């Protein structure tokens, strides 16, 4: 039997000093008992006095019992004439807690008092940051909160004390983007950029206004197909990294200095359009950007991995609001924004397929001996020979190694974090970010956004089949060497392989007649701000793995001798033979752009865009996406084939960057 312990809950606002007009909010205790928060023209008020709340004689409890604990109610109001971003955290005050955050569970309910919209958040263990809510609040809006806290049934904090303050922090938010997309979360080494067109075929990237308030240096506008872009640079190029990071707005960031280019995919929910494992045709996918880390979709799914020879599903999904999953009514918070146990406000997706140093022996003399390694530097840039000839495990580790100490990109890391393992773990990792090989679900998140009103499918420059992402058809065979280059366009979705009938990603020649831009038509937006190489280029391995007949991780020829942590791959049920039947296709999962975007139970034209649809099966346990340039047709961003994980001349991949739930506070 658990012993009772005394837990003292002291919740109040922590006073934070103001250092600039975009600094943290300052909390002041008023004579009426109210707590006012203000900074410059930003004024958010806590309307409830919660300076003394006690939770006495608390014992560890099951969730069902913990939810019966008394709730703490509080309200915040945005009195400013502009939208504000905020985060609410439980933090140590004068009296430091001795109970670990992970031993404390909570449930938060937020109601918009102006619209009566209520969001009941998932029950969670308090994370190391203490963050319980983050997002935006419109001018003159009131949010009502109910917070319930209890001790995890598996904890044993005998005789310890849990004492926390409520910390509310805020800042003015972008006024140039009206889509509702979450603000991009930049790491310390990332530079926000916009494209400055000099001519139809030339232009440069320049430092954007990270506050997104200055039209001249606008960073992003999802309503206008301008997804947020950011780059990392060399420590010492034509300009040093430190100088770039403090450079004036509009400063050119030279391509020769760039090491990686990223595009922000904000958290969203989408309307289910094919929830019954049926066939579907290309259509707009209706997307709503979500607030902070809200999970407002009506559908929830749980993994259900089967091992029978003819398994027909990989998950069980329900809609408790509508009673059942209903096409064009049920909604689903895209699962790509759940990373392990953590909810994300968005992800940074590599703008191009990965490459390596173009002067390296791997790039100049491609072979399995020269490239099938785990210690190659990964770049993400256009007009590069893509990195191939690696077995999947070496792709996985090369990408994880991008955040090791002293990496070429400037990602901050502990000086003792010098090695990674096949599980994906990095020794002494404490940098609050995670760079990992793309997962099947993350590919799906980009694909669905491309098919939304915010992507190329919604871009009026393109009509008919031109709404499909154009193919990167750059392909060259020199004897036994096969070359694929990043960031090219064949200015049609099914362009034949070539090195001449191609243009670079930033060719903005308008072809007219609904054909749109010659080069940018190969991006997910139909503009220079989207993601490239998702149709054609090299095949791209994704971390989507079919289990073996025992239900275990199935490396096959990928090179793994240990299973990666669960957060690093998407798992699918077993199937013994290659099959185009509905049962095999039904092993896809909501959001991964497989079963929902199947238009026929045929191999070569089974998915949207008329591209391949071959699900993993025994001997071919890994998923590969996007087709390749060397195939004359049958490519597309919904393309799926299965391979065994071995190194090939055709396969590349790309990284994804997840930033832990730290809010992007901006300095002056």
Provide a role label for each language-model segment.
Residues 2-64, 158-162, 167-183:
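Short, polar/proline-rich extracytoplasmic segments that appear immediately after membrane translocation
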Residues 441-444, 462, 471-500, 509-511, ...:
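C-terminal, surface-exposed recognition/capping segments
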Residues 181-330, 665-667:
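N-terminal module-boundary/linker segments of secreted carbohydrate-active enzymes
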Residues 275-341, 349, 359-362, 367-371, ...:
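Long, low-complexity, polar/charged, intrinsically disordered or flexibly structured peripheral segments
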Residues 252-259, 296-534:
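Short aromatic-cysteine micro-motif
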Residues 40-49, 91-129:
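A surface/secretory-pathway sequence property marking extracellular, secreted
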Residues 56-63, 114-144, 148:
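Extracellular adhesion/glycan-binding regions together with long Ser/Thr-
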Residues 66-92, 132-183:
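C-terminal, structured domain-capping segment
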């Amino acid at each position: 039997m658990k012993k009772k312990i005394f837990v003292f809950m002291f919740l109040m606002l922590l006073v934070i000093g103001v250092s600039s007009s975009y600094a943290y909010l300052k909390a002041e205790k008023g004579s009426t008992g109210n707590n006012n928060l203000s900074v410059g023209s930003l004024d958010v008020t806590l309307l409830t006095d919660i300076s003394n709340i006690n939770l006495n004689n608390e014992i560890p409890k099951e969730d069902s019992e913990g939810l019966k604990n008394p709730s703490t109610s509080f309200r915040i109001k945005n009195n400013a004439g502009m939208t504000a971003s905020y985060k609410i955290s439980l933090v140590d005050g004068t009296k430091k807690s001795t109970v670990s955050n992970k031993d404390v569970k909570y449930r938060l309910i937020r109601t918009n008092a102006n619209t009566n919209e209520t969001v009941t958040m998932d029950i969670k263990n308090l994370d190391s940051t203490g963050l319980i809510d983050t997002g935006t609040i419109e001018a003159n809006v009131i949010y009502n909160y109910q917070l319930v806290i209890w001790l995890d049934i598996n904890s044993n904090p005998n005789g310890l004390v849990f004492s926390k303050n409520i910390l509310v922090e805020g800042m003015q938010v972008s006024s140039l983007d009206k889509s509702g997309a979450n603000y991009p979360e930049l790491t310390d080494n990332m530079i926000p950029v916009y494209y400055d067109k000099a001519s139809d075929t030339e232009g440069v990237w320049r430092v954007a206004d990270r506050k997104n308030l200055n039209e001249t240096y606008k960073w992003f506008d999802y309503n206008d197909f301008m997804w947020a872009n950011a780059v990392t640079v060399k420590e010492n190029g034509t300009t040093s990294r430190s100088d770039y990071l403090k450079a004036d707005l509009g400063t050119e960031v030279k391509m020769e200095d760039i090491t990686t280019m990223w595009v922000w995919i904000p958290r969203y929910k989408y309307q289910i359009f094919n929830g019954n494992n049926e066939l579907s045709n290309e259509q707009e996918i209706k997307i709503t950007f979500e607030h902070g880390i809200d999970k407002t979709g009506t559908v929830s799914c749980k993994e259900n991995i089967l091992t029978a020879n003819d398994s027909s599903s990989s998950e069980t999904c329900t809609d408790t609001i509508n009673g059942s999953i209903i096409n064009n009514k049920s909604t689903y918070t895209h699962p790509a924004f759940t990373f392990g146990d953590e909810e994300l406000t968005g992800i940074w997706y590599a703008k191009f397929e990965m490459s390596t140093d173009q002067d390296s022996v791997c790039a100049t003399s491609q072979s399995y001996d020269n490239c099938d390694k785990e210690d190659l530097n990964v770049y993400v840039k256009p007009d590069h020979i893509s990195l191939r000839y690696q077995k999947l495990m070496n792709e996985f580790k090369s990408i994880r190694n991008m955040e090791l100490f002293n990496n070429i990109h400037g990602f901050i890391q502990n000086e003792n974090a010098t090695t990674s393992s096949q599980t994906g773990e990095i020794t002494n990792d404490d940098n609050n970010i995670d760079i990992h090989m793309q997962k099947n679900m993350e590919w799906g998140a980009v694909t669905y956004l491309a098919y939304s009103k915010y992507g190329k499918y919604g871009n009026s420059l393109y009509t008919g089949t031109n709404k499909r992402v154009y193919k990167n058809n750059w392909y060259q065979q020199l004897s036994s060497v096969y070359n694929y280059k990043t960031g090219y366009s064949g200015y049609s979705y099914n362009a034949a392989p070539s090195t001449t009938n191609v243009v670079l990603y930033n060719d903005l020649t308008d072809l007219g007649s609904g054909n749109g831009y010659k080069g940018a038509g190969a991006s997910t937006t139909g503009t220079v701000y989207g993601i490239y190489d998702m149709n054609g280029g090299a095949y791209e391995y994704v971390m989507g793995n079919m289990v073996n007949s025992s239900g275990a991780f199935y490396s096959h020829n990928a090179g793994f001798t240990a299973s990666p942590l669960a957060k690093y791959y998407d798992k699918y049920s077993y199937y013994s033979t290659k099959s185009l039947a509905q049962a095999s296709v039904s092993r896809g999962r909501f959001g991964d752009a497989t079963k929902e975007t199947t238009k026929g139970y045929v191999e070569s034209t089974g998915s949207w865009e008329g591209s391949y649809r071959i699900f993993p099966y025994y001997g071919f346990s890994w998923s590969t996406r996007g087709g390749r340039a060397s195939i004359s047709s049958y490519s597309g961003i919904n393309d799926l084939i299965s391979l065994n994980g071995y190194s090939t001349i055709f396969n590349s991949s790309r990284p994804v960057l997840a930033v832990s739930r730290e809010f992007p506070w901006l300095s002056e």
